[in-house]
Amino acid sequence: MASASYHISNLLEKMTSSDKDFRFMATNDLMTELQKDSIKLDDDSERKVVKMILRLLEDKNGEVQNLAVKCLGPLVSKVKEYQVETIVDTLCTNMLSDKEQLRDISSIGLKTVIGELPPASSGSALAANVCKKITGRLTSAIAKQEDVSVQLEALDIMADMLSRQGGLLVNFHPSILTCLLPQLTSPRLAVRKRTIIALGHLVMSCGNIVFVDLIEHLLSELSKNDSMSTTRTYIQCIAAISRQAGHRIGEYLEKIIPLVVKFCNVDDDELREYCIQAFESFVRRCPKEVYPHVSTIINICLKYLTYDPNYNYDDEDEDENAMDADGGDDDDQGSDDEYSDDDDMSWKVRRAAAKCLDAVVSTRHEMLPEFYKTVSPALIARFKEREENVKADVFHAYLSLLKQTRPVQSWLCDPDAMEQGDTPLTMLQSQVPNIVKALHKQMKEKSVKTRQCCFNMLTELVNVLPGALTQHIPVLVPGIIFSLNDKSSSSNLKIDALSCLYVILCNHSPQVFHPHVQALVPPVVACVGDPFYKITSEALLVTQQLVKVIRPLDQPSSFDATPYIKDLFTCTIKRLKAADIDQEVKERAISCMGQIICNLGDNLGPDLSNTLQIFLERLKNEITRLTTVKALTLIAGSPLKIDLRPVLGEGVPILASFLRKNQRALKLGTLSALDILIKNYSDSLTAAMIDAVLDELPPLISESDMHVSQMAISFLTTLAKVYPSSLSKISGSILNELIGLVRSPLLQGGALSAMLDFFQALVVTGTNNLGYMDLLRMLTGPVYSQSTALTHKQSYYSIAKCVAALTRACPKEGPAVVGQFIQDVKNSRSTDSIRLLALLSLGEVGHHIDLSGQLELKSVILEAFSSPSEEVKSAASYALGSISVGNLPEYLPFVLQEITSQPKRQYLLLHSLKEIISSASVAGLKPYVENIWALLLKHCECAEEGTRNVVAECLGKLTLIDPETLLPRLKGYLISGSSYARSSVVTAVKFTISDHPQPIDPLLKNCIGDFLKTLEDPDLNVRRVALVTFNSAAHNKPSLIRDLLDSVLPHLYNETKVRKELIREVEMGPFKHTVDDGLDIRKAAFECMYTLLDSCLDRLDIFEFLNHVEDGLKDHYDIKMLTFLMLVRLSTLCPSAVLQRLDRLVEPLRATCTTKVKANSVKQEFEKQDELKRSAMRAVAALLTIPEAEKSPLMSEFQSQISSNPELAAIFESIQKDSSSTNLESMDTS
């Protein structure tokens, strides 16, 4: 410490030197010292350092002054509070000095100090005291109006301080407002401009009284309209407030918008520009309140989009060059001060109109059809705009319209809607000829910026409507070639042109381009040879696509590709051989050459084997190996049967070695490559090559990565079919891993299917020790040897499926095995595990093989229905259903008879029936539909909910077999007097909805509204199942319910309310316990709301939606958890709406986070509260991602509370870490 003080006093001494270099070096050294975390200053040193730095601010040398200012930043955080106050006092005094240089340096110093203060949310006392000190001095400096430059600096600092520390100055806000308002009429426009900026920052954190005073002042001044100059300023000010605090100004729009509309009609271009800019900020920041005025705003924008009084467009076809009046091809973004004619300000009005239309189009999804009628044609007509900056904004607005039209949601592609002929997509389709006509002329413009806009537009158009340009390729190709060949084209323009060409090639059929290949190949080949790597990279993508165009392998083509092969090959091989090129170019050269060999390899002659040798080299390189594996997979799968023999000997062992690399994408790619090589090149592979691969397989077959396991098993299946002799090697570790995987509870889906295919392929190869009985013993052994009982029920299902797969492959073995399983079920000494496996195996075998010859099968299974084990009973039920599928005439009448005659076994028998309906073919079931239907209806009023649910599922799945007849019948039962029957039919509808198209869909769409009317049913349970059905439709097939939302949502929202009459007290011994019978239905309603956010967001009134989210934040644990999830989604989907409601959302979140559990509560209560806090904190973290959220005083205060509470701070920190690591993972493309 002493040595530090000595060193610093040395520096201070040098700072008094008459030599400016000494002073500079000493100040620089002090700066270095202050930046060290370890530095500690005693009081005396602090005082001296502060005094010296303040003295150096007045140094004669500018460089020393600048360094001294920089020292203020680290100094503020190293000295005590009263020293910081000394610094601030001195700087404020100096700001009013007569010396201009001292004023300037002091204002920079103040900004530096403010920038170093801890943020308002940290609750720092230092920040509060310093800001209060500065504020008084600044307000008087601003109010004096003596020296404009002082005023401007003071306004600048005030704005800076309000933006960073506005929340700490709440007590000063009224005086700040009082000093700022008069500046809006200052004779100096610069003063007005900075005042507007300061007011913009003030409204983010000021209280309501100050905000109301400000708005009332602006409204009254606007109404007076004293001078055009001040009116312009007030409109600008309102726009700035709206941009910074749109969520607060919304309620005043009813008064503001009529005034702004009125001023649009005044003949003053500058005022018009500001008015339209104000509209833009209202549209973006006050979506709900601006809604009634959107049509007016659109009309005003459409009017002024074409406002060009000083220019005559006459007939645009006459004068090709009219577009580019100023003849510039300057690529810079023009500033506000650049325009063609000093007196003509009309371009700024047109630009404001284009930007405002952009805002409207981007924020009002629900008006898309309307936009295509009015806005789209108007924008297309303005592609001819003569002012380049305006033209860029017109293009941008149209791009926004296209982006809104992208069919990301299923309802946009809904076939029913498409037939109506007025969807956004069909309307866009009809306007494509006009778009192309307008762009065609612009694509030959001198202006680079214009041509880039054209390419972006075409790219987006094709992404939205693939195939849209089929008729227009002849018109567009010359424009693309023009930019590729143009010597004056910038690199970015060429990249955009290539990228556009690539998207067009990918999204249209090859035949469309055949007439243009001759013109396209030379410029693309030239771009592949371009010295700039980004152009090369993009050109290689295009080349790869061109190869597919000139010789498509998936369809017949008469086009002669021969003249182009040499050029395409030569330019690509040059890039493939180059060693020092960019990584992306390397990869794309490999992919492109892979495509050339795949599609044109039979025309390459001797070049083929040389190129394959290069591939072999690339396979040995860690950086290029994955891309090369993918290229080889492509080549090996080519129908041209390319000769790969020259590289297989060396290549296959290299591929085998990749299977042990710790890179998942490489393992998967390699397994695909090996699979296709075995299929197509088995005669060229040796036993040694295959053994090398087999040696690497055991570690890949494991439950830790099911996808890799699935690929490995598929490879083994191919091997069994194509190269059966190699399988003798697998009986050791590979087979052990496979059998281990069959017993894993995680084996299902694609991996299970692959496993079944493998066993069927293996058992017929006749490999030693791998015959039917050997494999059967391996699979079922553990169940019979009591030592290793399988713990998971899923394992039994997997083994049974494998047994059935083996039996299907060897049908002769079937009767004996089935007989053995029947004995296992009958045998009184069999364990439950053995019975379980035997029943499931009988079911799986009987599903595919008719077992009606086994006479005692029925009685054995029915006997198992009486087992004390629930799992055995469930397996018997499944087995009976599955066996029935194998011979419906024999078993289905038997099952129906049993359901009628055996009431005690009804539940299990209904499960058997469900299995039959789910699995049997439609044709097989058709004759029995009426009998099944009649039986089910008898049981749909059963008081037992479990039975009713099975009946409902059967009814729903049965309806799918003959929807025309059965759906109207289901609908008929909605008027049943029994609430049980009504709930059964509503639940049945849920099972008719799936996420893929079905014949029932149009019929369902017509009548689902009737089923959803049960949301008004008097019975609570019927309403609950109606919500569950609605949720299923919203999730799986939103097109069914989109048009019903206006009538459904009020009933849905109604069910989110807590009902006092459904809450009752139950006495449990000495304790009283509260039971809420309405909880389940509220939960169902909130689940529907969550689903609607993903599937029907554009049809929701988000503010009404938020009202109910707010209620949910104060509800039961389960519902709070759901609403926290909703807040996370809403923060991403509609940030501006959430921002408007932020203050109302913060309080319930704070309440959850600060709730304490009673000390004597059970452990479960503590865990629940902990989970609630974590979820609430996730919601808070999501809310804070909304720009400007932390500027809300309540949110800022809550943040301080979190950071000052160690428990909450720790939770919050871990959540932020989690979210950042999740973001990184999602970026990892491998």
UniProtKB/Swiss-Prot annotation:
SUPFAM superfamilies: ARM repeat (SSF48371)
Repeat (HEAT) residue spans along the chain: 2-39, 44-81, 83-119, 131-165, 171-208, 210-247, 248-282, 289-366, 370-407, 424-467, 471-510, 515-552, 563-602, 606-643, 646-683, 688-725, 729-768, 770-808, 809-845, 852-889, 890-927, 928-960, 961-998, 1002-1039, 1043-1097, 1099-1133, 1140-1189
Top-rank taxon: Eukaryota
Gene Ontology MF terms: TBP-class protein binding
Keyword Cytoplasm: yes
Compartments where located: Cytoplasm; Nucleus
Location of region: Disordered: 315-344
Modified residues (N-acetylalanine): A2
Family stated for the protein in its record: Belongs to the CAND family.
The name this protein goes by in its record: Cullin-associated NEDD8-dissociated protein 1
Organism, as annotated: Mus musculus (Mouse)
